[in-house]
């Protein structure tokens, strides 16, 4: 999808500028770090961050985190409807997930009604290939390999996306790979500069 590719490229550029270089706009609209913004060493993150930022956990910023689930495969009527059933392959390479290879019927999705994800939820793979992320662009559900943040505060969407992206990139750089599995509790405990 060309639009998705363009949005992803723009997001990557913004991510690097704001969250790696910390050159987000300051109060005067100038790049924070390049304009002499104060930086302090953060022991938890093992890097310099802008002065005044705290280090809360993801789960303290946004409380509604949903771990996906697969409805019973024994009942074929649970599948083949209009509700995207998002997996890691559907997210990979897509900033926004518009469709999925598999779908759920209303019956299948309603059998696990607490697993519905509203538009704009951030889905993050936490089993197998960890750190693959994308925003669902339709009402959807995911399988159990994915934790999703349902946002109470719209302003946290991009921030948490980029913070998690940086977290997973740093984890991979330090170890050569990212963990094989991450529970919902471990995911909610990720510390970010905020």
List PLM regions with ranges.
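Short, well-ordered beta-strand elements within core beta-sheets of diverse protein domains
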Residues: 45-49, 147-151, 188-194
């Amino acid at each position: 999808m060309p639009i998705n590719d363009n949005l992803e490229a723009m997001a990557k550029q913004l991510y690097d500028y704001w969250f790696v270089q910390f050159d987000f706009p300051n109060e005067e609209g100038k790049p924070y770090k390049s304009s002499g913004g104060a930086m302090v060493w953060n022991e938890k993150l093992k890097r310099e961050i802008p002065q005044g930022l705290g280090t809360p956990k993801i789960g303290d910023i946004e409380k509604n985190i949903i771990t996906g689930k697969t409805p019973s495969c024994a009942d074929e009527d649970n599948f083949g409807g209009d509700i995207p059933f998002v997996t890691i392959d559907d997210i990979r390479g897509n900033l926004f997930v518009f469709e999925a290879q598999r779908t759920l019927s209303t019956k299948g999705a309603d059998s696990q009604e607490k697993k519905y994800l509203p538009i704009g939820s951030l889905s993050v793979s936490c089993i197998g290939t960890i750190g693959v992320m994308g925003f669902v662009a339709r009402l959807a559900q995911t399988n159990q390999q994915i934790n999703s943040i349902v946002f109470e505060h719209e302003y946290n969407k991009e921030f948490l996306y980029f913070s998690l992206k940086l977290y997973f990139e740093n984890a991979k750089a330090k170890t050569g790979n990212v963990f094989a599995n991450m529970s919902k509790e471990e995911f909610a405990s990720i510390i970010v500069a905020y």
